Every structure is written in structure tokens, then in C-alpha cells.
Amino acid sequence: MLAKRIIPCLDVRDGQVVKGVQFRNHEIIGDIVPLAQRYAEEGADELVFYDITASSDGRVVDKSWVKRVAEVIDIPFCVAGGIKSAEDAARILEFGADKVSINSPALANPQLITDLADKFGVQCIVVGIDSYFDKETGKYQVYQFTGDEARTKATKWETKDWVQEVQKRGAGEIVLNMMNQDGVRNGYDIDQLNMVRSVCNVPLIASGGAGAMEHFAEAYKKTNVDGALAASVFHKQIINIGELKQYLKQQDVEVRL
């Protein structure tokens, strides 16, 4: 049985780590490299960096910090932000990232998923999906440009359909960002994860809602996700990653210690 992954998420804007609630009102958390180092030392299995305004600003992720992070950590890390071509992805991978993640650019050009998977291998290609539960329609809808409040918008895709589409096109992993839960710290959306898991045959990472150690255990036990991503509970030192792994081990969840 593969060990479940614990993945701190670092949202980056203007060279600093920030965190919002439900993708709004971002506050500065601190500098990128020291935080990355801290999480690697605490026992994180992987890190994810989102340059949150790159897509909405029409630019690619700022690569200067990618190289600095690669120099100081020895765990895999994934970078996202405005990657619109194989050339963009190649540069980020050359600077030391292990994976690239695409979100809004994949919605604008789904062929990009296939192009990247063909060039770099599916194991390098993550698709991030920002999913919002619309209480009026009772449906999960995919959103794009979520790094910028003014430009965030719904797409034509329902979450389940987009999950199936990106797999057909070569996504090697999916990160499901559950917008209603983001930063609220009241637990992952178990129903949504199970709905997506039922049609997802690649590794699935839960994102949005972690507030306590039991939320991680619940996600792993009730939905069979491969990893859980969290931000504010780690940034604010509410949860220590080493202690979280010991707790999960006691709950019979397979983790790397």
C-alpha cells in the first residue's frame, strides 16, 4: 500500500507566501525559502507552490525563487502559475521543480495537458481544479483565474466532467481545490472527494478545509485520496507535520515517518 502524502501548499504573490480564505483577502505569511525549508525539515512529503496571480496577470511563474527552493530542499516540489507552453514548463523543471501544475491554462487550452504529458511524461503533469459548490444549482462547477478576486469566473465545466476530460488528455495527478472549504478549517468536503474519486483513476490530492489532525485522517479513511494538501494550519503552526504523521500512524493510516 502506498504511503499517503502530506503536502503543504504555498501560495506565492510578489515573491512572498500569502494565504486567503475562500480565495480572497490574502495576508502575507512570510518568505518562500525559509518556509519551504521548515516544511521539508518537519517531514512534508512534497511541496506545492502556486504563483496565484500569474495566470490572471498573463505571465509565467517567477522562476528566481524556484531555483533557490531547489537548492535548499531534498523533497519533491510542484510549481504552478501561468504555464501555457512546453517551453514554460521546461524552464521550471530545469530550475529544479519535479512537477508542474496547470489550472486556468488547461481550461483555456485543454490540448496543453496532452502536449506536456507527451513531452515530459504524465508523472510530471498535475492538473489543479478549482471546484465550487453552487447551492442554487446543487452542482460542483469549475472556476478559473481564482488567484485574482476581480477576474475569478465560472467555466462551462462541471467538476466531474472536467476530471474525466483531463485524465483522457494525460493528467498524471489531480489536485482538487474545494473553494467553499478553502481556509475555513472545518474539514475536507468528503462527499465531493468521493464523487471525484469514483471517476478519477490517477492520484488524487484533496485541498481545502484542513483545520485539525482528524480532518486528514477522515479524508484518507473515507475517500481514499492519495494525498492531502493544506496551507493555513501549517503556516500558522496549528499543526506540526511530524506530529500529524505520528497521529495518522496511530489511526492506521500508512505514512512515511
UniProtKB/Swiss-Prot annotation:
Any single GO CC term annotated in Swiss-Prot or TrEMBL for this entry: cytoplasm
Keywords per UniProt: Amino-acid biosynthesis, Cytoplasm, Histidine biosynthesis, Lyase
GO BP annotations, alphabetical order: L-histidine biosynthetic process
Keyword Acetylation: no
Recorded family membership: Belongs to the HisA/HisF family.
Active site, renumbered: D11, D130
Name of the gene: hisF
Compartments in which it is found: Cytoplasm
Highest taxon above the source species: Bacteria
Biological pathway: Amino-acid biosynthesis; L-histidine biosynthesis; L-histidine from 5-phospho-alpha-D-ribose 1-diphosphate: step 5/9
EC nos: 4.3.2.10
Binding partners and assembly: Heterodimer of HisH and HisF.
Cleaved signal peptide residues: none
UniProt protein name: Imidazole glycerol phosphate synthase subunit HisF
Top-level EC class as recorded in UniProt: lyase
Keyword presence, Amino-acid biosynthesis: yes
A Pfam family per the record: His_biosynth
Molecular function GO terms recorded: imidazoleglycerol-phosphate synthase activity; lyase activity
Function noted in UniProt: IGPS catalyzes the conversion of PRFAR and glutamine to IGP, AICAR and glutamate. The HisF subunit catalyzes the cyclization activity that produces IGP and AICAR from PRFAR using the ammonia provided by the HisH subunit.
Reactions accelerated catalytically: 5-[(5-phospho-1-deoxy-D-ribulos-1-ylimino)methylamino]-1-(5-phospho-beta-D-ribosyl)imidazole-4-carboxamide + L-glutamine = D-erythro-1-(imidazol-4-yl)glycerol 3-phosphate + 5-amino-1-(5-phospho-beta-D-ribosyl)imidazole-4-carboxamide + L-glutamate + H(+)
